[in-house]
Amino acid sequence: TDALKEVIEPLEKSSEKITVSYIEEDSAEDGGFGYIPDRLPAIAIIDKEGKDHGMVIYGIPTAGLFRAFMRMIVMFSTGEHNLDDEMVEKINNMEKTELQVLVTPSTPKCDETVEIADSFAFCSEKVTCSVTELIEFPEIAERYEVLDVPKTIVDEDLKFTGSYDRSELLRIIEERISDVEE
């Protein structure tokens, strides 16, 4: 979309390290995703080796979501994810986990929540994180009965609203895994 290009093109022009590929809605081209996203517009950040870390934003990153998007770019460029070694080890020893973070652009705490969930996906192939901007995708808000944001969905079966810190998210995921195993 033109609105997405308005956000992304200045970033691409600002650094030769950023390359942008666009997927048109009716295209069979994957634009580097490795798959065709189920919702467009979508942004996947892929590292310089072409590796997809399982992080995608559905919608146009504006306001607070733009800050989270910029932090994703910094995470990719520096490799810094703000998780200590013990936490990374625990994340890598978990079952595969899919995180969906549902946000609106200007709601406080959404960008921090996105950054934490993204850091889990960045440091482990066992975690994916999709972020959906609900103003652009009201059908997703309806499907998950979202009344407040941020709302995080873990593997489609655990849904909780509000922000969290890194250790709290890890605890929630570990408890969900142990509940499923029992």
State where each predicted segment sits.
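Oxidative protein folding and maturation machinery
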Residues: T1-G31, L40-A42
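Thiol-based oxidoreductase modules, predominantly thioredoxin-like and allied folds used
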Residues: S15-A28, E125-E139
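Generic beta-strand/beta-sheet core signal
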Residues: I23, L102-T104, T132, D155
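Feature detects long, helix-prone N-terminal segments enriched in hydrophobes
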Residues: S27, D47, E89-I91, E182
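Structural micro-motif
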Residues: E29-H53, R143-D155
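Non-catalytic, surface beta->alpha helical segment in thiol-disulfide oxidoreductase systems
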Residues: I45-E80, I153-E182
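Long, charged amphipathic helices and adjacent flexible linkers at domain junctions
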Residues: G79-N92
